[in-house]
Regions:
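Alpha-helical scaffold segments in soluble metabolic enzymes
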Residues: 15, 41, 53, 66
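Conserved active-site segment immediately N-terminal to the catalytic lysine
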Residues: 43-55
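Poly-acidic low-complexity segments
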Residues: 12, 41, 86-88
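Short, well-ordered, mixed-charge alpha-helical segments that flank or form enzyme active sites
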Residues: 5-10, 35-39, 44, 58-61, ...
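An acidic intrinsically disordered interaction segment
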Residues: 26, 31-33, 78-84
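Active-site C-terminal subdomain of aminotransferase-like
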Residues: 55-88
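Active-site phosphate-binding strand-loop segment of PLP-dependent enzymes
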Residues: 1-32, 49, 57
């Protein structure tokens, strides 16, 4: 979670992504409350997957979810060998 509106807390997404990559993990950022409201440099920070919601900081109609995947994440998804067992 990049930011939390009820407390005003914001994580250091850049550092968390660096830690994930250090251990060869993908980094996912929940930017529902931060996209368009605070600096968020998806390409520069090399975020692998990021999603948001239109109803929060974007202040738009609810029901839309902007999503972006890096080439690294897309490649990992394409190479998946097992089906997703559950979406819940």
């Amino acid at each position: 979670v990049h930011a939390e509106t009820s407390t005003g807390a914001q994580s250091d997404a850049k550092s968390l992504v660096e830690i994930a990559h250090k251990y060869n993990c993908l980094a996912i950022v929940d930017s529902v409350t931060s996209l368009a409201g605070t600096p968020l440099k998806v390409d520069e920070w090399e975020i692998d997957a990021i999603y948001s919601g239109s109803q929060k900081c974007l202040s738009s109609s609810p029901g839309l979810s902007p999503v972006s995947f890096s080439e690294r994440a897309a490649d990992k998804i394409k190479r998946r060998k097992t089906k997703v067992q559950s979406w819940f």
